[in-house]
Amino acid sequence: MGLIFQPLFWQYVATSYALMVLGFLDETVEKAIKSEGYCSRILRAQGGTRKEGYNEFSMRVEGDPEFYKPGNTYRVTILAVSPAYFRGFTLIALKEGKEGEKEEDHAGSFQIIDEEDTQFMSNCPVAVTESTPRRRTRIQVFWTAPSIGTGCVILKASIVQKKIIYFQDEGSLTKRMCELDLTLEGGNEKTIPDCCACGTAKYRLTFYGNWSEKAHPKDYPRRANHWSAIIGGSHSGEYVLWEYGQASDGVKQVAELGSPVKMEEEIRQKGDEVLTVIKAKAQWPAWQPLNVRAAPSAEFSVDRSRHLMSFLAMMGPSPDWNVGLTSEDLCTKECGWVQKVVQDLIPWDAGTDSGVTYESPNKPTIPQDKIRPLTSLDHPQSPSMTRGGPIIPIARVVIERIARKGEQCNIIPDNVDDIVADLVTEEKDEDDTPETCIYSNWSPWSACSSATCDKGKRMRQRMLKAQLDLSVPCPDTQDFEPCMGPGCSDDEASTCMMSEWITWSPCSASCGMGIEVRERYVKQFPEDGSLCKVPTEETEKCIVNEECEPSSCIVTEWAEWEECSATCRMGMKKRHRMIKMTPADGSMCKADTTEVEKCMMPECHTIPCVLSPWSEWSDCSVTCGKGTRTRQRMLKSPSELGDCNEELELKQVEKCMLPECPISCELTEWSYWSECNKSCGKGHMIRTRMITMEPQFGGAVCPETVQRKKCRLRKCQKSSGNERRHLKDAREKRRSEKIKEDSDGEQYPVCKMKPWTAWTECTKFCGGGIQERFMTVKKRFKSSQFTSCKDKKEIRACNVHPC
């Protein structure tokens, strides 16, 4: 009886399943006829029973945002809480208040992630549905938000669990999001919520430029079109790199010159408010296939206090137009880290230059405007798209989580690593290997013992090389840890899809013992963006010709090739290996340890030399008189790619003249004091100095040039006639001696002098001046020895009274 019943049962199941599939197909055809190309409310089980599914089914948008950013891409997930499941679904996005009867009622667009699981509806191309009616617990698609001005959007999902049971338009299957007003100060929600995630996360930012003549033909600049270097950072909510408000000096320099230097200084000055400075290379030209194949990218990290990221890049040439993200939150409300952000970027104006076309001359905006998005309603000469229509994105940024570090605090594990961590009840103690035990390094972990999606264990080994103290036991040479098998179903978000093992490589040794390797690769990474921990390489010992010749040596495998020596056209690259064991006979190892080969890089693309305008002249280098002033300009195109002359003038210097500097009075040093003008009694003596430079242009006036002081040699005494005669003779004697000295030691007068001239006029009317008089030679006498006489000069003070 049981044998008869079993085939009948399976026949009934197969028949029911076929009827269910036919029901779906009939329903799809019927709706296709009625919809006439548009989507009305689509029910996948019109005659079935509608139930409440608040506790079993839900639709989630990654990050659970209340607002959407125009052009941003979001991951949408429909979930069934175990043990519930569903077989079919429909997902649409409608403008608020619309029923989907017209094509323009729908908002944004969906992107298929897994074509084996989801597809666009044949009778409603803007909606997403299942590919096959099988059991499932989750599906995921990407939804790209509509352009600016769309307003609020409602995502609606319908769930078919069985042929006669469906769920639709309930709170958990409906998500309402409104457009974020980018013109508001800050461009984000009023407040940034605190982050509750644990540990850190590492992300990779990849920038895809789509600014090409084909996509944006109006006034496209064929010369020197480029993207500047990307500059940004991961930061806290206390710091804003840029926002839809006033541009900082760093933003202005990026927007006008494409230089990230000032912006990087501003970021680094914020200290602990910034975790990572994000930098990526510039792109010359702005679009080429290489930019898509090897798009500029940069890696950065976030943590609980610095969970926001911002960046910007200039499109050049342009007045001050840029693209970028500001304060993008990578922390989720579930205390985890966002897996992926994909956003199309539209240009924005920094508000520092009033130019309206790509190559408008510099026209500073005074006073400076606020940063604002470019729209199709800007100046008629602006290269914006169709007037009044949407702005076509000119770039796309993809931010992907590539690693998580530290203890994570997600409530629900979302990858194999998290599940394995739950299996370990106690952390292993630190390595307590005794110093007397010498081991080899641990081998790689073996494959998990479970071939299915179940708990298992894996093993690694090491060899005991030496036991220095036999009384001290050495720990085990094998180590085990729990693991999850690689056979998890496609519904597991953390499953890695692996290829088959590739055949074993040749043995690494030409003789004796070596190693052979086999590899496999990751065909598909987990949906949640976590890293695959499944081993991709296995090694095994191998023996070739058990006895090696004495002169042979053992070398390691070749290392990876180094980077090409050239950035374009022909270059050279190297790789190295090391000698593991020299020949047993002591001879030199003849194996090559370095290998060189040619490498070909993309064609060298030179670009026109692009210079910024000359800056204003600097102030004169002096405050008066003659000096110099300078002005500068910057090289905007990378020197390694441009055809700029190395001797290109980037700095100019010219002379400048300011009013004459004041010149103060200058004098000689004081002369020695003269002799006292009296031989006895009270007298005085003087000293003088000369003016070498009169004061000019308001300089300091000249001080006194004559100083006098009192002198007294001895008291004068009354003398008798003989004494007076004696004094007279003494004076005559001194006079004759003086004449002798003046005539270079002649014993007798050899010349006749003219009388003294009159005193010259005083050099000053007051404050001390000087007078001079002169005595010249009248006649010279000749003798057997030729001698000569000297002219004489006397100086005295005059007008010494104060002015």
Swiss-Prot record:
Q: List the disulfide bonds.
A: C39-C124, C152-C178, C195-C331, C196-C335, C198-C409, C437-C474, C448-C483, C453-C488, C496-C532, C507-C511, C542-C548, C553-C589, C564-C568, C599-C604
- The positions annotated for binding Ca(2+) are D320, D349, D353
Residue ranges occupied by any Spondin domain in the UniProt entry:
191-383
PROSITE patterns per UniProt: REELIN, SPONDIN, TSP1
Report the record's Gene Ontology biological process terms: cell adhesion
Question: Which SUPFAM superfamilies does its entry note?
Answer: TSP-1 type 1 repeat
**What are the residue boundaries of the Reelin domain, all occurrences included?**
24-190
Localization recorded for this chain is: Secreted, Extracellular space, Extracellular matrix
Assigned GO CC terms: extracellular matrix; extracellular region
Q: Where is the composition biased (Polar residues)?
A: 354-365
Against Pfam families, the record matches this protein to: Reeler, Spond_N, TSP1_spondin, TSP_1
Q: From which residue to which does any coiled coil extend?
A: none
Instruction: Using the UniProt annotation, give the residues that carry a glycan (glycosylation sites).
Output: N210, N677
Described purpose of this protein according to its UniProt entry: Promotes the attachment of spinal cord and sensory neuron cells and the outgrowth of neurites in vitro. May contribute to the growth and guidance of axons in both the spinal cord and the PNS.
Instruction: Give the protein's recorded name.
Output: Spondin-1
User: What is the name of the gene encoding this protein?
Assistant: spon1
